[in-house]
């Protein structure tokens, strides 16, 4: 069958004789014209519109929700009656995972090149879901003899049909509103592109460019040849391929909503389901006739008789409606060998669903064309099923792909991850938002047991965030990210208990905002472990802060000098005693008291500091003092609103104190407004949940990456609101699995976080002993230590 090439008389003379006899693909398609940008008219005077939906991820969405959405879809079908038919098409198409590259020849750029190359080679697929609503033709009124009046009558009838169609489409869109339904348009190329994909298994934008061509001709852009049970697609703008088509021969006795979810194979595929309602009165008569027939022959298959009685009762009570159904599965491959491998998988999936699905031989051409909306005349195997069974078999299930760059504050996804269904997911820290407006919340939680790869994932995301030039600060624990920070061109230091820190807030916080913060912070510091200050003591602290800021001699901005400023407070020396704890030579003097100038630098694209000694300290006061001041320094740094990522390992240790409990929510809001993402890592959710501000924290971290833990218990995930499926993913996977559960504002997703495609770059990202064994223990003295491993 040819591609509808317009052939002139001279061309016919030099072409083979068989060309004259070859039928066109368009002649078998029903599409005539575009009524408007959304609506197509057919040869049979039917009208239809197509709705694209995002679907539900059946791997993670609770079964109750899947059943509820199935019931909603089935209910719409029942309510719209027998004047409307429905098709559901799932078309597999290859995903373009390219992203703007990380510029340069840095470690981050090498990681990006390696990862993007891997993602492109994986042949990952998305499966679009398109619901076609078909307005079946009404009985026409008598046509007047007058040409003018007949035209007016026909025009009004067409308009009435389109209005009814539009009402049902809007009704369905409202019912499926949580699936982001949108009507496909011809002007975008999507409407005709979808119809063409039913022929080819590949969806590309297609337009109706000339008025003298039918829509059928516009979407027929390949040559189709049927040989035995094979379908050969040749010519046109798409590569030549070979395909097969299957249809249901025997239906299952029962259906369930996930029965065909495994038909999401990574190949060019079209899965079509067609449902044409049967008038209830006619169906009741058919059921009654079948029951009478079975009674007449004294049928012993009582289960079947009972099923017929139940169907008759449910139909009479309006619980269900029946319709003619056909399901077809068309698959395409580059070679017949590849096609044979896919075919066996199709059969296995059908057997698992309790369905007998057969390949089509000489009938392949009829099933092939019957896939198209409004092409019922080509159907050869129709079954009578209920609207509920149709909603099961055509379930609107699909793994989401994440938010595109235009829908997130940083203008591009951070990276792509494969999913376990061989699709792909765009990872973004942020919730959906306009890049031109105030940033949405991008704070993220990474959960995983020790050794599960939390730090590696955080380092990978930090490297990929260089796509947007993000600045990165790392609050590290046990040097887990040291090698990654250094490889990424960053500075790394260590704060050790009892040793000089380089920190001195008295030197830095001298402007108006700084004085206000410093006063509040010092008062809390003085009260910690000692009780609340008296009003005159608080006033003395504020006065001393002001004097410190106004001092012309900068050498006076030390803790020893500050203690002398509050010594005159008429409180019997109580405030001075509290202050002296922090001066050199006293209990906490090592933290701030040994410094004159603050030389703790946060300059650079990557800055990491190991806080193991601080985090492991049993002294909550010292931990709070160090961390709160570093947070403050970063808070001042991010005022420039440059994209920034702050990574905090063992976050529950870092933030579990009264000071942060009172301020963490506002601090996270401030960070968000300053274009900053905070990534917190911990082993278990209950560690955060049990802290003084745990519930606030969990609510403030909308994105959550959870790595599997077979040894975890349900209580370890308290506060996250996980359903049974999500818990099974986290607690039931095999040891060593790199599957992760990702929760974001667009749902819950199962992604594959296996980064082994990075080769030795992954070992460097992970650091520790394995990293040192690869690059050498002296890597800290060699800024380019990672080079030479990028092509390994």
Give, region by region, the residue ranges found by the protein language model:
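Hydrophobic positions on the alpha1 helix immediately C-terminal to the Walker A/P-loop
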Residues: 457
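Hydrophobic anchor at the beta1->P-loop junction of P-loop NTPases
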Residues: 446
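Conserved lysine of the Walker
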Residues: 454
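A short helix-turn-beta junction within AAA+ P-loop NTPase domains corresponding to the substrate/partner-engaging
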Residues: 693-706
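Conserved AAA+ ATPase "SRH/arginine-finger" region at the nucleotide-binding site
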Residues: 495-497, 703-712
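Walker A (P-loop) phosphate-binding loop of P-loop NTPases
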Residues: 451
